[in-house]
UniProtKB/Swiss-Prot annotation:
HAMAP family: FBPase_class3. Its cofactor is Mn(2+). One of its GO terms (molecular function) is fructose 1,6-bisphosphate 1-phosphatase activity. Belongs to the FBPase class 3 family. It comes from Lactococcus lactis subsp. cremoris (strain MG1363). Pathway: Carbohydrate biosynthesis; gluconeogenesis. This is Fructose-1,6-bisphosphatase class 3. GO terms for biological process: gluconeogenesis. Keywords: Carbohydrate metabolism, Hydrolase, Manganese.
Length: 640
C-alpha cells in the first residue's frame, strides 16, 4: 500500500507501543470462540411469536442457564429464563403476588442469578464487548457487581452494600431489566432474517421496529418484502397487490393505523361497484372476529384491488416484452360476452367474475376515477414517514442474498434448468444467470428505491417481475395463478409449477455448484426460506446431505395446519449448526404467569471438527487484514 495510507493509519495511534497493543488486542480477539448467529425466516407479521423466539434465542437462553446452574431444577431454570425473556412483565407480576419484603428478597436473589449468567455468557467475549453491551447508566456498577458476584467473605460486605444501596434508591428492578437485556444480547450476537417479514400476520411494522433497534442484523429480501418496497417506491401494481393481500387476511389496520394510509376513496369505490363473492371471502386466522359488514367490505375491496391489479399488470406486460409474461396477460384472453377465458388452448367458465369497470375493447385501460384513486394512494404510500423509515431499513440492511461466514443465504431459489444449469434472464439483449442474476436484481431494486417518483421505469417494473417472474429468485415458478384461483373452478389451472431448483436442491452436487458460483467452498451451507416445509407429512428441512437447510416452517398461522409446526430457526455457534423446530406460541401473559415457553426440538445439522474461532469468520478476515497493516506500520513506524 502507498505511504499516504500508512501515514493516515499512524495518526490513529499515539506511539509505536500503542500500535503493538492494538496488534496484540486484535490477535487475541481472533482466537476467541465464534459468536452465535441466529437465523429466522418467513415471520409474516407474527410479532408475538417472532419476539418470543428472539427473546429466548431459540432455546439458547435455557441452555446457557442449565450449563451455568446444573444444580437447578427445571422449574427454577424456567423461572429465571422467564425473567430474562420478559424482565419488566415478570417483575410486575411478582410485585403483585408478594409483599414488599418478599419481593425485595426475590429481586436480590435473582439479581445474583443474572449476574452469574452474564459472567457465564460473556466468557467468550472481550471485557470491552461485554462492557459495551451494558446500558451506559449502569456500566460501572455492573462491572463491579459481576467481578464480585463470586467474591470471598473478604468482599461480601462490599458486594452486599452495593445491592443495599441500589435497593434503597429504587434501582434494583431497573438493574435486573438491564441485566436481562444484556444476557439476551450476548447469547445471540447476530440475527439473519432470510426474508418475508410482511403479509398475512398483523404486525410486520412491529417486527421491523424491533429489528431497527437490534445491534447486529441483516435481511435477505423475500418476495413479500419486495412488493411492499415496490409499493412505497412508486409501483401502482405492487401497491394494489399489497392492499389486496391486506384485505384478504383482514389486516387493513397495517395500512390505516400503522402506516397512516388513507383508504377511504378506494373503499367507497369498492362499495359502489362490487358485491361480495365467495372466492374473495377474507381468510381470517383463529381468534380474529369481524362483523358481517366488515367482512363484506374486505371482500369488495379485495375484488376491487384484484381487478385493478390485473389491469395494471396487463399494461406492464405490454411495455416489457423482455419479461416474457405474455401468457399472463389474462384480461385479453377473456370472452366478456360469454364470461369465459381461454388458457393454453382450453376454455373455462369464469365464476362470479365481476368487472364493472372493464372495457372489453380495451380491458387494461383505467377509468378516470381509477386513475385518481391510484394517484391518491401512491402519494399516501410515498409520504408515509413510518413506511419510509421501514423501507429505508430494508434497503440499508437488506440484499438479494448474503454470503456470511461460509454460508449462502437466499430467500427463495436460484433459477435452474432441469439439467442443473443456471437459468438465464435476458433484458436489453444481455443475459444474466446464477450470482450475476441476483446481483443484477439487487442493483435494480436499489435504483427503484432511489427514484420513487418513477412508476413505469425498468427498475420499478422489475420489482413486479421479482414477485411473479419465472426467473425471479424470490418466486421461482412458471406463473402466479392468482386470477385462476379467484375465478376458475378447475383446480388444475391453480397449479404453480416450481422451478427445477426445488427438486434438484436435494442433490449435494447441485448445492456445491451453487456455493462455488458465489465464491464459497463445499463445506458451506445454503440457507433458504420461502417454501413451507410440511414436517407433519415427513418432509425433511435438511437436504443434500446437510448442505441445504430450509427454515420456513410456519411462523404464519395461516400455514401451521399445513406444516404441523410453528416455524424453524437456525443457530450457528462455535460448535456447529443446529436446526430448531418450534411449536406454536401462546401469549406473553401465559409466558410470564405460568412460565410457558415455546417447545423447541433441536437437531444437529453440522458439527465442526475444530471449534470455530473469530478468525474463521467474515469479521475475523477483516481483523486479520487490519493486523497485517498494523504489523507493517509497526515495523516501519519511524518511516511514516
Amino acid at each position: 500500500m502507498d505511504k499516504k495510507y500508512y501515514q493516515l493509519l499512524k495518526k490513529q495511534f499515539s506511539s509505536k507501543e500503542a500500535v503493538l497493543t492494538e496488534i496484540i488486542n486484535l490477535s487475541a480477539i481472533c482466537e476467541l470462540p465464534k459468536a452465535t448467529e441466529h437465523f429466522m425466516s418467513d415471520v409474516h407479521g407474527e410479532y408475538d411469536a417472532f419476539n418470543h423466539v428472539l427473546r429466548n434465542g431459540s432455546g439458547s437462553i435455557k441452555e446457557k442457564l442449565r450449563d451455568c446452574f446444573p444444580q437447578f431444577s427445571s422449574a427454577e431454570i424456567s423461572s429465571v429464563a422467564t425473567l430474562i425473556y420478559y424482565p419488566q412483565e415478570k417483575l410486575d407480576s411478582e410485585c403483585q403476588l408478594q409483599d414488599k419484603k418478599l419481593f425485595e428478597h426475590y429481586c436480590r436473589l435473582n439479581l445474583v442469578y443474572l449476574l452469574k449468567t452474564v459472567k457465564f455468557v460473556g466468557q467468550k467475549y472481550t471485557r470491552s464487548k461485554v462492557r459495551k453491551a451494558f446500558p451506559e447508566k449502569f456500566r460501572y456498577i455492573l462491572e463491579e457487581l459481576i467481578n464480585e458476584v463470586d467474591s470471598t467473605t473478604d468482599k461480601q460486605d462490599y458486594f452486599d452494600s452495593i445491592l443495599s444501596q441500589l435497593q434503597n434508591l429504587g434501582e434494583l428492578t431497573r438493574l435486573i431489566v438491564a441485566l436481562a437485556d444484556t444476557i439476551r444480547r450476548l447469547t445471540v450476537d447476530h440475527l439473519h432474517v432470510v426474508g418475508d417479514i410482511y403479509d398475512r400476520g398483523p404486525y410486520p411494522d412491529k417486527i421491523i421496529d424491533r429489528l431497527i433497534n437490534m445491534p447486529s442484523v441483516d435481511v435477505q429480501w423475500g418476495n413479500h418484502d419486495i412488493v411492499w418496497m415496490a409499493a412505497f417506491s412508486g409501483s401502482p401494481l405492487a401497491m394494489m397487490n399489497v392492499i389486496r393481500i391486506c384485505a384478504r387476511y383482514g389486516n387493513l389496520d397495517i395500512l390505516e393505523e400503522s402506516y397512516g394510509i388513507n383508504l377511504r376513496a378506494i373503499l367507497e369505490y369498492a362499495e359502489r361497484y362490487y358485491e361480495p363473492s365467495e372466492a374473495f371471502r377474507p381468510r381470517l386466522v383463529d381468534g380474529v372476529r369481524l362483523s358481517a359488514d366488515e367482512k363484506a367490505l374486505l371482500n369488495k375491496l379485495q375484488q376491487t384491488t384484484a381487478i385493478l391489479q390485473f389491469k395494471l399488470e396487463s399494461q406492464l406486460i405490454e411495455r416489457r416484452p423482455d419479461f416474457q409474461l405474455e401468457h399472463r396477460d389474462l384480461l385479453h384472453f377473456i370472452d366478456f360476452s360469454q364470461n369465459k377465458i381461454e388458457l393454453a388452448g382450453e376454455t373455462y367458465d369464469l365464476i362470479d367474475f365481476q368487472a364493472p369497470t372493464i372495457n372489453p375493447e380495451q380491458p387494461a385501460s383505467l377509468t378516470e376515477e381509477e386513475e385518481k384513486i391510484i394517484a391518491h394512494l401512491l402519494n399516501n404510500f410515498k409520504t408515509s414517514d413510518k413506511l419510509k423509515r421501514h423501507v429505508g431499513f430494508l434497503q440499508e440492511k437488506g440484499a438479494m442474498y448474503l454470503s456470511y461466514n461460509g454460508n449462502l443465504l437466499i430467500h427463495g431459489c436460484l433459477p435452474l434448468h432441469e439439467n442443473g444449469d443456471f437459468k438465464s434472464f435476458t433484458i436489453d439483449k444481455k443475459a444474466y444467470a446464477g450470482r450475476d442474476l441476483l446481483d443484477f436484481f439487487d442493483s435494480e431494486v436499489r435504483k427503484c428505491l432511489a427514484h420513487p417518483e418513477e412508476s413505469e421505469d425498468l427498475a420499478t417494473d422489475l420489482m413486479w417481475y421479482l414477485w411473479v417472474g419465472e426467473c425471479s429468485s424470490l418466486f421461482g415458478k412458471t406463473a402466479m395463478t392468482t386470477f385462476e384461483r379467484y375465478y376458475i373452478k378447475d383446480k388444475s389451472t391453480h397449479v404453480e409449477k416450481k422451478n427445477p431448483y426445488y427438486q434438484l436442491r436435494e442433490q449435494p452436487k447441485i448445492i456445491t455448484k451453487i456455493l462455488e458460483n458465489f465464491g464459497l467452498d463445499e463445506n458451506g451451507h445454503l440457507v433458504n426460506g420461502h417454501t413451507p416445509i410440511k414436517e407433519k407429512n415427513g418432509e425433511n428441512p435438511i437436504k443434500a446431505d446437510g448442505k441445504l437447510i430450509v427454515i420456513d416452517g410456519g411462523f404464519a398461522k395461516a400455514y401451521q395446519k399445513e406444516t404441523g409446526i410453528a416455524g424453524y430457526t437456525l443457530l450457528y455457534n462455535s460448535f456447529g449448526i443446529q436446526l430448531v423446530a418450534h411449536q406454536p406460541f401462546s401469549t406473553v401473559k401465559a409466558a410470564v404467569e405460568k412460565g410457558t415457553d415455546i417447545i423447541s426440538l433441536k437437531r444437529l445439522v453440522a458439527e465442526v471438527d475444530e471449534r470455530k474461532r473469530v478468525k474463521d469468520t467474515n469479521v475475523g478476515q477483516t481483523l486479520l487484514s487490519e493486523i497485517a497493516d498494523l504489523e507493517v506500520l509497526f515495523e516501519h513506524y519511524e518511516d511514516y
